Structure formats: structure tokens, C-alpha cells
Amino acid sequence: MKNQSSTPASQWARRDFLKTSAVTFLGLAFTRLPVMAGPATRADFDQLVPADKKLSPEWVKSLFERGTPQVLRGRELQFVGMPVGGIGAGQLYLGGDGRLWHWDIFNQFIFTGAEHYAKPLMPSSPLTQKFSLTLGDKVVSLDRDGFSDVSFRGEYPIGVVNYADANLPIAVKLEAFSPFIPLNTDDSSLPVTVFQFTIRNLSAATVETTLTGELENGACLYHRNRSGVLKNSFVMTQSTTMLLCSAEAENDANRMARPDIIFEDWNHENYSGWTVAGAAFGSGPIKKSAIPSYQGDVGGDTARVVNSHATATGESIELKDAATGKLISRDFLIERNFITFWIGGGKAKGNSQLGLSLVVDGKTVLAASGKDDNAMSLQYFEVAAYAGKKAHLEIIDDATGTWGNVGVGKITFTDEHGKTELMEKLSDFGTMALALLGDADEISGDKSAIFSEKLIGTLGKKLTLAAGESKTVTFVLAWHFPNLSIKNAFANCGRYYATKFPSAQAVVEYVAKNFPRLAGQTKLWRDTWYDSTLPFWFLDRTFLNTSILATSTCYRLANGRFYGWEGVGDCAGTCGHVYLYAQAIARLFPELERDLRERTDFGLAQKPDGAIRFRGEFNHIPAVDAQSGYVLRALREHQMSVDDQFLRRIWPKVKLAMEWLITKDGNADGLIESNQHNTLDTDWHGKVAWLSGLYLAALAAAAQMADEVGDTEFAAQCRKILAAGQRNFAKQLFDGEYFSNQVDPKHLAAINSGTGCEIDQVFGQSWAFQIGLPRVLPPKQTVSALKSLWRYNFAPDAGDYHKKMGPGRWYAMPGEAGLLMCTFPRRGWDYAQAKGKGPEWAAGYFNECMNGFEHQVAGHMIWEGMTLEGLAVERALHDRYAASRRNPWNEIECGDHYARSMASYGVYLAACGFEYHGPKQHIGFAPKLTPEDFQCAFTSAEGWGRFSQTTESGKRKAEITVLWGSLKLKTIALENESAHSVKVFLAGQLLSVNVKRTGKRALITLKNSVQISAGEKLEIRFA
């Protein structure tokens, strides 16, 4: 699609561009969202990206205010889907009213793309699961159907649902979660969801009620067309009452073998026993010898077959494929377990009907088609679940395009089928459990049922509540489906949790035994995160993307490997230039990132020359941004380690990766010029600001790691190239306002943002802040570049920009604000030139708002002191994912729960000014919001806790409190401009220290290293 603007971007003078004015204001249609901009004049609508954003004072104020926790009600509940399973254990949503939905725990492949932004998923469930209360003779479901006033507060990992109704004497609070304990990866990877219900009597009289949990047996849920038995049983232990759901094959040992029934062999000249419609099937089955030679050998084991191409009217291939028709068989009773058949021809696509279908009770229950191949293959329907029912077969050719034909051979009814997969090997074979912690007063559903029937079990707890009294009841839902295969990636890779537990029963027993610790530490982390001075909205947005780990984007395989899609079911290989942006995993569960570096990136993915395939074993080329990222991430993972053993193990491979980048540089001037594959999915050519900037950051990281392992020669080499690159980067790529690219004139056909204002142009410096490197890019020009992104790329109505500029995917609808990927404010370079002859889908990225990139820039702005702009970018994104519009817990790019969005944790680190180096026993904070009164959570290699600093009478006091694990410290970096002396206390004991001041920064060195244990506090007093 060509640029639709009436004034091409290439004709916009800078002065004219700066005169563009505001569009509309955000949140007009959603009154609960704070108004971002306005009022605007009619002239403000004339241009798409105004220099003056016309931010309303109220909206700006809301960016900085602590505010109150956001509680969702009414229509805001409709899209809510907060993941409540363990890391890599599947995907299960807690809905806005407490119901579970999107049960992606059965190892079924689900593909997602970009569509769920414009059309959000609505709650649905393949099985019955619910909780209810019995009050007298009334059963009240714990959802919006049962209570008139339902509210939801999501504080990941815990979702809180409150239920009230003026007509009921009780109120209920639900806290639902899966154990989530930073640094304790295994206990955060359990296939379990906990439900803690607190029921309160609001009346003046005693209330008797029963809280009941209900669960349908979901074992073999997607294979109910075969024969099998569902089994429910109850297991009572000292601490739990458990409904255990399983499945097993029918016992066929005593069944007499039944002979096959050949239903149709086509060895007759007409369609005797079949009703014929249309022109595709002719007057009867065709001899294989009469089939046109260009169709080849169609196979099968009969002389005649059905072939809707060979028998169709028409003289050309196109006319024959365009013919349509249908064959309908005589009715029959299903008396065998399988129907086998030979089938070939076209593959059913879209809404067209093509192939063989089984119709039972007037409904199509099973269907098969060819594989766009004339050669037929032997396939089967498993029909035991329909035994005794009347049925018929239909052979349908409703397709009119290429491969619009079907071929069918012999059809047999049989009990024996060599291709039958053993039940215990099925993807959804396994167990489920719903347990009540404690004794149940009522149970039901202890029985068996055949696969074609539903099997539901219940557990109930009776409660007697005095006036005003509250009681808490806890249920645990667990699942165990070990037979994982990942489409387009791994066959039979298995689930990590299945190596720890043999069944759902074992999962429940582990959780019950350790419940006080698991629940207590999960809530402790939640409370620590929110016990902060940072705004509630900011804490919500920067942490909630951590839930991506608990979706089907991420997996823990049976061999312990961490693996991920880019987004759910989309783009294999734990993509290096997507996960490059993600900061959450490394800080919360660093062992996963260390495994990814050691096992995959610097292991199976690395070539002998040092290049790293950015999709591991699933592609064969490196990407320049990913390659730099592997080096940067190696330093980060080293910093989140206790000692230097990890770095020493991987250093030779890290060095090799860096040497490949240096070779890519060619002339060692610090700027890469040759082909550069990258996260925008094509090769760019020439001097590209953001790719060379990342390269410079990687050089700085490699130099630091080389220092730490004693490779002084390589450290010097990296720093020499870095120094040259820093000079050339500023001199050659800075245009006085921002950094742009020098396009290789030999590759004008390739996509390149050229002189456009590109979102990642100073990404290298953003990364340098994340890992505490010295400055990589010049401060003045870098800030100017960020200001240019604010000026040229931040659109109060990014959806309108996309609508008018096109093409691209919809990640911001009209009326929604966002930071655009690239705009073209300079003469001589516009979208058409940036596209060159590249694919429209890739060039269309320039017109989009992509969450992960926006998080990255927002964090960088905050690091550089552009706090208002950084918060505005982050808040605009947050408001796009308002619950009234779409699921707040599903940031979408190329797939649901897109991994790049875990960059949001980096925005939080920027606000804290956080720095950490475990092996050096160093920690530091430089808060960017309210430094005079600041509090935040932090993580380290072995522990986590709370940092705070306050100022009274001009004197600052800081505290580092460890709440879980431990923290070893030798140095502490803080900011204080006026302090003359520093005193440090641990558990009340004064420590001997040395202080070095550089500007506002005070580096405090302890004479002796200390270890702060859980419950202990280190206090720093400035005077």
C-alpha cells in the first residue's frame, strides 16, 4: 500500500513538521481512563504527530501520583485473563469474575498472531469448573451470574476477586494464584492454581453455608472420539481431600475379535448406495488406469476410486478443479471402533468443504481431507464413542480453486488399527485434581464414565459463621499432562514438572505439605512489590508482563531447557533479538537466562566462527542485534550470579561471539556496514545507528568481562574499537537532532529507515544503563535523540496515523496513543524509499506501535532524566491495554503474550536507578521519582527485599532490608549531593566504611564484606 498522505513525507520541511499539532485526546470513549490531552482546536487535526502533545495537566499529574490500586468492575471484567499457572506449565486464565478460562494445559498447539489486539479473546472454557455457595435451598455461583457486585484487582501473581450482593447475607473474597517466589524457579513452576476463599457473614444472625468446588474430568479431553474410560476417585490424606481425575483404555481382553466390514471398495461402474449431486463425481468411480497421467499414481488398494478431478466436467485442469459435487452414502450403524479410508487430493482451506466427513445424528463429527497431493494415504476415524448410533458418510468437493478436488479409496469398518496411538502417549493423557485443604463435608462424582459422557466431581465444605465472622477455605487445582510436543520445534520433549512429580496427586500433596511457605512467600513478594512509593499504575504495568512466563509462550522442557516462542505458538527458537529486550526473567529467575546462554546461545546455536543462530537449532543465520545482545546478556547473567564460575565457563564462547561481530565491522571503526539481519526481519545495509549502537555496547560489555577473567589483551582490543566507534557514531550518524542511518547506495532496494526517526536508534545506551556500563553513547546527542522520538514519534492518536499512513498491523486503534516505530520528518527520505523493494509486511512495521520497543524507550528516557516523557510513553501503552478495551495481561505483537514485552521490567529498574553485580558484591540505587522519599523492591543473586530512602531536615537515610534469602555486599552506590559523612549500620552495629564521591554519586565501600540475611536491615545515614 502506498503512502496515502496528501502531502508526501519527502516534501515536509522540518519547520512545517514541527508546526503539526495535536490530534484528539485519549480515553474519550472510556470515561474511567484519565484524559491525556486536550482540548484541541480544529487545526490540531491537520497533522498526525504534533510537536506540542497538548498533555492535560491532570493527566501529567496522574503519571507521578501514587494513586490507588485499580479495581475493575462491570464491562471492565469481560476481557480479563490473568495467567495463574506456574512457569512453563501451560496457560490458564483467571477471569474477571473468578472463573477459569483458556485451559491451555493439555498440550494442544495454539497459534496466535496479531489479531487479538483489534479483536480480543472472549472467555471460553472446554470443560466445567466452578465454585458455588449454598445458602438454604439456594445455590449461588461465585461469578457474575451469582453476585450482582463483582470486582477484580490484579496484582500479579495474585488475582483478587470480591463478591457482594445486597440480597445475600455474605461477602466473599477470592485470592487466586500459583506459587511465585523470585529466585526459587522450581517452586514457581508448579502446575497448580490456588484458590483462597474468605467468606464473611455481613448479617446479625448466624449463617450456615457450604462452599463447593466442581471440576469436570479433562483427561484425554481432545481424544474423546476414541474408546476409553474416565475415572474419578477421592483421596483423603491428613491434610487434604482430593478429587483425582484420570483416564484409561477400555479393557478389551475379553472382547471377541470382530471381522472387518468393507463398506465400500468402489469396484462397480456406478455409485450404487450413494446419492450423487453436482458435476464433480461423474456417473461412477473411475478406473485408476483412466485417471489423467498428470495426476500420477493415486495409490490405494482397489482398481476403481473416487476422484473428483478425473471425473469432473471440463477440459482444463482449472475447470476440473472448479467443478463441485457431493456423494452421500447409505445410512449405517456404527459397529466397529474405526473407519479406515484412503484419501488424497486437496487440503480443506478456509470455509470450503473438501474431503470425507462422518455425519452422526445430522451433525458432522469427524472430517478428513488430502494434503494437496493426488497420492492417497491411509487414514482413519476413531468412532468407538459413537457405537450403536446411525451415521452416514459424505464425500464433498465444494472447493473451486487450485487443488479443488478429492480422491477416496476403499472404506473399511474395523476394530484393529495399526496406527492407533497408545492412550498413555496421547498429548492430553494425564491427571487432574481438585483438592480441599482439610476435610471435605460433601463429595460426589466418585465413579467412571465412557469418553462420550461428561464426568464431574465435587467437594464441599460446610461453614457456620457467627454474626460478623469470617472463615477461609482453600482449594488447590493441579494438573499433570507430561506428553508435550511443540509443533515445528520438538517431538516428545515432555514437561519439566513431570520430572518432579508423577501425577497431579503428587503435585497437590507437595503444595499441601509446603503451603504455608509457598503461599506466604508468594504474598510476601506481592506485598513487597506494591509496598512502594511508585505509582500503582506503574507497578502494575511494569510487572504484569512477567506473567508471560506462565503462558504458552514459555516452556520448561523435561531436560530442563528453557524455551520460548516469540508469542504463543508463533515463531520458534527463543528468538535472540526478541528476548534481547526482555529484562524480567534475568532479574527474577536468573537461572533460566543462564541456562539459555550456556545450553543454547553459546552452546548448540553457536557456529565454529562465533556466529550464533538467533533461533537456536531452528534457523541457520545470525542476526546482528541478537549477536550483540548475547554478549550483553552474558554480562547481565554474570552480574546476577553469586560468583564468577558461570562467566568463566562461557567466556571462550562469549569472546568468540564478540570476535565475529568485530569481523563484521571489517575496518574496526566501530560501525558495522555490511548486511545486518535484525529484529525487523530483513537485512539492512550501510551504517545503521541502532545496530552499531548495540555493537558498541557489546564491545563495552565484552571489555568488562575480559577484565574480570584476566584477558587484558582482548579487553584493550574491544576498548580501542569502542573509542573509535564512539567518535564515528557521533560524527557520522548524528544529524544535529537525532541519529540516522547512512544507507548503502548499492542496496537501495533493501528496507532501511534511512534518515527516519527510528525507535531503537540509541538502544545501545539503554542496554548500558541496564548493566551498569560506563556511557557508550554521548549524553547530549543521546538525549536529543530521545527528545526527537518524543517530538516525531509520540502520537496522541497513533491509530489515526496508522489509518492514514498504512500499512502495518493494528497495535493502536484510532484514539489510542503510542510511540511509533519510525517516522520520516526529513526531506529526501519517506516510507516508500525506506521500503525500497522489500516486502510490505516488513516495511509496515514502521507505522506500528510495538509494546516491547516502547517499554525500552520509556525506560531509557527515565534513565536520562526525561521522566515525564518516559512515564507518558509507558502510561499511553498502559492505557491502550485498559481492561475496558482488551486483556491487560496480554500485550500482543506477533502473537499473544509477546516475549519482548518483558522489557517492561527494565522500565521499573530505570525508575529505581538500579545497579547490581553479584560477584563484586555491589548494589546501587539512584531513584528517578521522589528520591527524597522513595521505596522499592529489589532482587539479587541470592535474595530479595526492599530498598528505601528518606530525607529529613536535609539529611538522607537509606535502608536495604532483605526479606528472602540473603545479600552479600562490599560496595553500595547511592546519590546524595550534600552529605559530608556516611555511617553504615547492620543489625545496629556500626561498620567501617570508605566513601568516594563522583558528582552526586557516593560509592560506599565496606571494610569487610557483609551478608545480610532475611529479616536483617542495612542502614546508611548521610550527614
Regions found by a protein language model. Give the residues of each.
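Non-catalytic C-terminal accessory modules of carbohydrate-active enzymes
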Residues: G88, R99-W101, N107-E175, P182-T185, ...
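Active-site core of glycosidic bond-cleaving carbohydrate-active enzymes
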Residues: G567-R613, Q627, R648, P652, ...
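Extended extracellular/luminal ectodomain segments enriched in beta-structured repeat modules
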Residues: F332-T340, K389, S966-L969
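Extracellular carbohydrate-recognition regions
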Residues: R255-K288, H417
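Extracellular carbohydrate recognition and processing domains
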Residues: V359-K390, I396-G404
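Short beta-strands within extracellular/lumenal beta-sheet-rich domains
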Residues: A310-E335, S377-Q379, L459-G460, R956-A958
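Acidic/polar, glycine-enriched structural segments that form the non-catalytic walls/loops
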Residues: G38-E65, V71-E76, V160, D165-K173, ...
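N-terminal secretory signal peptides and thylakoid transit peptides that target proteins
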Residues: S5-F25
